[in-house]
Amino acid sequence: LLALDTTPDEILAIAITHEHTDHINGLKTFLKNSDATLLASKDTLDALIKKECIPTKTKIITIDNKSIDICGIKINRFATSHDCEGSSGYTLTLPDNKKVAICTDLGVMTDTVRQAIMGSDLVLLESNHDIEMLKKGPYPPPLKVRILSDKGHLSNNICAAELKTLLQNGTKRFILGHLSQHNNTPLLAKSCATASLM
């Protein structure tokens, strides 16, 4: 927030993708000091309530199969394939009809995901790991299997394979997201993505 010169009071809503700690760390503290509305799937909200991450004062909106409008921004949820219930990606359609898609923490690109993000002007797409780095890296074998599974994370190769189709369907900009610190580098992710577009 400091880098954006933004205060918690200026945040009107927070959309949570799923319940894993790396995505909700600090949520409770933030919500205690904010009037932001919390958006998530029913399953994710249920998990957050069980983990006592949501202060009682927080306004909650379940966003499963409906569109939510916040200050003229239309927010839609789509299901992602990850190892928790209710894992989500989001599209945001701005008042000028430009569309942004946020899509991380998915082990596989499903038709549901493709349909949801197709035609977005900007897509933030997971490019989590280089497969060889992951296989040779320090993670224990069960974690490697989890990451490589259909409920894990997208590799650079899988991400790159999707970019050309997105580009052909109107996407103008990409952000490669959720890069692993241990199993990837920004240069590897970018090189793989760039090669797929040639």
Predicted regions and their residues:
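Active-site environment of divalent metal-dependent phosphoester hydrolases
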Residues: H20-I24, L45-A47, C84-E85, V108-D111, ...
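Core dinuclear metal-dependent hydrolase active-site scaffold
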Residues: L1-T6, N25, I63-L122
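Cap/insert and terminal regions of metallo-dependent hydrolase folds
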Residues: D111-M198
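Hydrophobic packing residues within well-ordered alpha-helices of enzyme cores
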Residues: L1, L27-F30, L48, V113, ...
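Active-site neighborhood of phospho(di)ester-bond hydrolases with catalytic His/Asp-centered motifs
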Residues: I11-E19, L39-K42, A101-T104, L124-E126, ...
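Glycine/small-residue-rich loop that forms an oxyanion/phosphate-binding "nest" at active or ligand-binding sites
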Residues: I24-G86
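Helix N-cap/coil-helix junction residues
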Residues: T6, C53-I54, Q168
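Active-site metal-binding motif and surrounding structural segment of the metallo-beta-lactamase
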Residues: L1-A40
